[in-house]
Amino acid sequence: VLAEIEFFNVEADKTTPIQLEMRESKDEIQVIGNFNSENKFKRADNGEETSLLATTGRGYYIVALLGSRQEPTNHAMRDIAAVKKELEDWGRGIVLLFPDEKGYKNFDPKEFGDLPGTITYGLDIDGAIQKEMATAMKLQNANTLPIFLIADTFNRVVFVSQGYTIGLGEQLMKVIHKL
């Protein structure tokens, strides 16, 4: 875990501005876990049950579990819209899943601007993908959404993000540019 510690004084009744620095590894991408690309989900557009691999093809992809009408998800989707062109230029599949049909029906992609055309929406059948994400990535609370992974079809995970994250789109692109 990359961390930075800075000591500073806070005087009574005063604001102390501090620059937040997100540390990042200067090294190459590292495999941080495993996730089965043969996991099945139900496509939202046609109701067909299919696998992540069949949807995205061989190679790297992004898979996420979203909580519709929840601020962390809304923020993440605006971050995704902000890097639409870069994600489309990358050319890989993005699978955005919802825990249930109600969640999908409550989701309106138009709320977030222009999202990448490489997105496939779907439903997580019986919560199997969410459970595997939580177990494989050792997430403390499987119900904290959204959860984003960048993985490949050899089942290697190189990025995970859960809950509220600042600059998710930029973080995804930093990893993608190193692949």
Where do the model's predicted regions map?
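Structured interaction patches on ligand/partner-binding surfaces of diverse proteins
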Residues: 2-23
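N-terminal "domain-start" segment that seeds a small globular fold
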Residues: 17-53
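Thiol-/selenol-based redox modules, centered on thioredoxin-like
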Residues: 18-33, 144-179
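A short beta-strand-turn-helix
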Residues: 38-61, 78-82, 86
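Structural microenvironment flanking redox-active thiols in thiol-disulfide oxidoreductases
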Residues: 61, 72-116, 127-133
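Hydrophobic beta-strand anchors of alpha/beta hydrolase catalytic cores
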Residues: 62-63, 148
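Structural micro-motif
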Residues: 116-120, 135-149
